[in-house]
């Protein structure tokens, strides 16, 4: 899910040529969910093989990995590990939303509303262990390296960029910045137009490059303050303070200096503030000295 910090970022539209020769750490779960959500039939059903097994994730993976490789861009997929207990609330809420979307999908099919059916179907996507294993097998066949993180894949990828193993993290989630990724790429190869649901309106989608240092400079805050700001808004690990969005949160963090003083001014309380900070500053990762990343010839 992630947190929406777009209004606070400095976004530079880029094209594939600017990424040629670069090594990108791909937020694997993030990208696979994109494929499972978007690669569907008109009625919302995912692609399946003759045995009824979902293949949307593999279709998307083969297409995108092959295309980016042909453009001289090296990918390293980083997979999430065991979620932290603080994320349980979010995961439970997602599960309930998917159940609701499943019911609404079925209802839309009954009345013949295919546009609504497809929209609701996209919200039911589930990434199974079998799909993850299949993805890793395909990556091995393609000669594309992958890393299994102990916990958050974005945190592992961010560290690999900081340590010079990779050049940027490719993800849709602005949480990547909270984990300290120096550079992130959004909308990787998604340039084009996208139709807004239930509207006869199309929006442009461009690849975006976001540099953490420029984000901090623009807002005149530190990395620790960015994390405190996110906690006030609400993250994957906490609900945040009602009525606090990016702009209001930024203002109060700059006025108060940190989350403790901001909460005091707001007369609000977040009990596990230090634990939440540690989720971004000290997340469990593998040392890059123990991570092997090598691009090989396809099998």
What do the PLM-derived regions correspond to, one by one?
Residues 2-10, 14, 18-162, 182-184, ...:
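Noncatalytic, basic helical substrate-engagement surface that gates or grips nucleic-acid strands
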Residues 82-83, 152-156, 177-179, 247, ...:
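Short amphipathic alpha-helical segments embedded in low-complexity Lys/Glu-rich regions
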Residues 104-118, 196-214:
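Charged, glycine/proline-rich intrinsically disordered loops and linkers
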């Amino acid at each position: 899910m992630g947190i929406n910090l777009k209004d606070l970022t400095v976004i530079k539209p880029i094209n594939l040529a600017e990424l040629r020769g670069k090594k990108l750490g791909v937020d694997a779960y993030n990208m696979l969910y994109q494929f499972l959500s978007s690669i569907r039939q008109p009625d919302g059903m995912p692609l399946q093989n003759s045995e009824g097994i979902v293949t949307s994730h593999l279709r998307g993976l083969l297409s995108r990995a092959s295309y980016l490789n042909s453009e001289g861009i090296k990918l390293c997929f980083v997979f999430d590990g065991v979620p932290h207990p603080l994320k349980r609330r979010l995961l439970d809420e997602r599960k309930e939303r998917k159940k609701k979307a499943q019911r609404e999908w079925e209802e839309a099919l009954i009345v013949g509303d295919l546009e609504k059916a497809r929209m609701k179907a996209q919200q039911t996507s589930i990434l199974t262990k079998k799909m993850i294993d299949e993805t890793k097998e395909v990556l091995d066949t393609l000669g594309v390296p992958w890393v299994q993180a102990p916990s958050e894949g974005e945190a592992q990828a961010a560290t690999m960029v900081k340590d010079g193993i990779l050049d940027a993290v490719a993800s849709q989630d602005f949480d990547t910045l909270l984990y300290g990724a120096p550079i992130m790429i959004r909308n990787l190869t998604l340039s084009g137009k996208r139709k807004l649901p239930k509207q006869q309106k199309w929006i442009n989608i461009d690849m975006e490059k976001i540099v953490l240092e420029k984000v901090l400079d623009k807002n005149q805050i530190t990395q620790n303050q960015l994390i405190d700001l996110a906690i006030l808004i609400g993250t994957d690990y906490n609900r945040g303070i009602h009525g606090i969005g990016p702009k209001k949160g930024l203002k109060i963090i700059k006025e108060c200096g940190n989350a403790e003083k901001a909460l005091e001014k707001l007369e609000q309380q977040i009990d596990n503030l230090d634990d939440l900070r540690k989720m971004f500053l000290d997340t469990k990762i593998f040392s890059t000295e123990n991570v092997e990343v090598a691009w090989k010839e396809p099998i």
